[in-house]
Amino acid sequence: WGPETNQQISHVFHKVEKDFLITSGMIIPVKILDTIGGYPKNFFIDGIDIDICAKAKSKGFGIYCVKGCVLKQQFGSNLTFTFWGKTYPASNYNPQRLYGIFRNHIIIYRSTHSLAVLKLIKGYSVAFIRAILLFENNKINKLQAIARGVKDGILYKI
């Protein structure tokens, strides 16, 4: 048995406001999706959650994480490497996935001008490029895919 319909249950969970969350496991009222224009139609996979969150924040909606909920999810190969005593993650994504990540995130920034999105792009860029240069195989193809993704994102090529 669950709580009565329309009953406030926020007192049961501890929630924390965030700039972004992954959409896997996210509960979004249809009315909010309608207000923000729904999911991006031209993105294959990467950037969908960031686009949804950035558009929702721009319309005054909050993004909340309910603490204590766990969604086990693996990104890429989930490898870690140690370099000079520090451990780094490496996704080992294929070049096509890296292209999509960079293209979509730049397109999202261009459409929202969100500083939080820009900060996220900078963080992703450093992490992915560092991992590729230091630990991953197929370096040239991956870096070329990132460069094409950045270029196509700037040119708004979907």
Protein language model features and the residues they cover:
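Acidic/His-rich active-site region of diverse nucleotide-sugar glycosyltransferases
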Residues: 1-38
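Aromatic-acidic/polar surface patches that form glycan- and anion
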Residues: 21-22, 45-46, 94, 98, ...
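A short, conserved alpha-helix in the catalytic core of glycosyltransferases
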Residues: 26, 32-37, 42-70
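Active-site donor/metal-binding and catalytic loop motifs
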Residues: 66-89
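A short acidic, glycine-rich active-site loop
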Residues: 85-99
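Non-catalytic, C-terminal membrane-associated alpha-helical segments of glycosyltransferases
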Residues: 110-158
